[in-house]
Amino acid sequence: MPDKLKYIFLLLICALGQSAFAQAPTNPNYPGNNPGQQQRRLNLNDTATTKLQSTDQQLDSLRKRMDKKRDTVVFSSKFIRVTNERLLRDSTQLFPLDTGIFNFENYSPLLQPRDPKISLGNTGRDERSLLYDPSRTIGFDAGLHTLDAYLLNPQDINYYRARVPYTQLYYISGGLKEQIFKVLHTQNVNPRLNVGFNLNFAGSQGFYSSNQVLEQNVSNVNAAAFTWYESKSKRYNLLGNLIYNNLKTPETGSILKDSIFKTGSIDKTTEQVRLPATYENWAGSGLYLKQFYYIGRIDSLKKEGGKSLNILPTQRVAYTLSYNTRKYNFIQNDADAYRVFPDYYFSSNHSRDSLSVTHLQNDFSYSFYLRSKNVRFIKNEVKLDVGLTQDYYQYSQYISDTTLNQYGNKVVQPLKVQGASFQDITLKAKLSYRLSDRIGLDGDFQQIAQGRDAGDFLYDAKLKLGGGKKAGRIIFEGYSQSSTPPLAYTNWISNHFIFHDKFKSQKTNSVSFNYINDALKLDLKAEYFLISDYLYFAAQPGGIDAHPVQLGSDINLLKVSLGKSFAWRRWHFDDFLVYQKTDYQSTIRTPEFYNYCSLYYKMFLFNVLYSNLGINVRYNTEYAAPSYATGLGQFYNGPDIKFSSYPIATIFFKATLQHTNFFVMYDYANQGLFSPGFYTVNRYPQMDHLLKFGVSWSFYN
């Protein structure tokens, strides 16, 4: 009997143990059973029961938990596409956003490697091209262009297709010497409508006479609001922008100490200038609307990679409306104690000269495309564009003069000295033929048929020959141009300069050969110019009386440029050379040789920082430096002075990290090695060495 009780007792213990284990789930996801989870204390007093859920309820609960998790999609530049008006002229083309750091440190419009400029000292001051670079426009021209590099024009606006809002902040700092800040924002309101804005600020105290002199500060503001609408059928497009420009730059007449690099200076910011409170101001605004509609069959061509399409129309009609006003002001608040001006006609110690120009343009065009239905690549395509442009201009010029009011007191009032209104009618035609994707011929013809500038023309022809990626491509081009003399050369009235002249139209004929090989990273271009009735400003020997002059002889000019990039492992060397030769070197006043080279080492630091460390060097040979006419806004041929020329070196480090690009550079790092400073314009010393910092942030949200 005791043995039977022993077995019955053992069986009861086993049954109780089984019940205890049944209350502890063996699911590894249960708190405490998964060693990877944090232990959670159980409330033994909790008597609540868990309600059983159906399969649909369990899926809903899982969906809620997934929605609460953080979105794992990383927005980047892949969600942004960009284009501009030029790329939309023939078809709808979109390109990825450029987020690289190539040429990032060359932010200034004065120091672009392939378009160097001379200036009065620093960014924001009056400038012109160092190399010969003729204008290829016809029609009315006010003749004032020394601040063109800082203007924001309708053709400078980019248009976007943004799947997410895109914002870019851009900041450059060289201390009080130079600061630039830019903001760009764009987003799609819906898949077909994009809006955005640009806002640019530039300020500079410069390097000389900047000690607590507000009038000597550069202060530039550019603002634009833009939009791009594309219909659902992709037939209708609308480009629009509103632009505002306000540029202010000092007109110092140069510093008093002409030999500052020989005698030195204790503090350059306190060096006296001839006109400490005189400046010029350009202000203007404009509206630009361009509409085009595709008629008939629409083709599409896939880009490389097949991620996006080019929309190719067979017929297109376009209309452009442009309206802008611009006012050029010269404000003199100083007595001319150091004879900056050759003369005065209305007031000896102050000037309020201004020129106001209003421009209204209506442009109509029709395009016809003839191509085969197979558009894997363009073959045997003929394109014809015809158009008509109406330009209406109204200008007025004012000075300030002292008059007697009704009470017999002397007062200074603005006085209108001239004004006119007129229109030009321009006929346009463009013919293009593409035998294949490697052979193409383009002809572009513009002729002003009626109006003030009737007779102006620009005829241009190009032949493009492609030989594949390894062989490269060749472009032959020739153009002929005749343009009416600008207003500043023929009919100008201001306090210090008055011109009433008649000149012939300036004519330019040019032919060029351009060989481009992307595989070899080679770009060779040879250009020949024949210039007749060349217009420029000059002064009497030893004088400062700048006035317009027309050369009676033809000018021959040869310009050869070569660009080449080399790479060896992580070392890279980019070089650009220009050789210019003319039979009127003292008239054109440009250097015979120019070179820009960049040597840098590519690195990938800490496995996250793509960076370049290198040096840029600019050099040009000696040339007769032009002078600058304060109050006229023109560079002119003054004393035949040549300044010694030495290389100018800049050391830089630039990098990119996720959505941020930045650089640190030491500009003019070799100052004092060859010379204590340099000139590009007579009597206007250029920048000193300066540590600069720049950063660009991109946001995609």
Which role fits each region the language model picked out?
Residues M1-F9:
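Bacterial N-terminal signal peptides that target proteins for export
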Residues K6-Y7, N27-P28, K559, D574:
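Generic early N-terminus positional signal peaking at residue ~5-7
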Residues F9-G17:
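Bacterial N-terminal signal peptides
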Residues L10-L11, E127, S598, G694:
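Generic recognition of well-ordered alpha-helical segments
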Residues Q18-A22:
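Sec/Tat signal peptide C-region and signal peptidase I cleavage site
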Residues Q23-G284, I295-I311, K464-A471, Y684-Q686, ...:
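Membrane-proximal, glycine/serine-rich, low-complexity loop/turn segments characteristic
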Residues A162-V164, T186, N241, A277, ...:
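Exposed, low-structure sequence patches enriched in small/polar residues
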Residues F341-F346:
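N-terminal low-complexity tails
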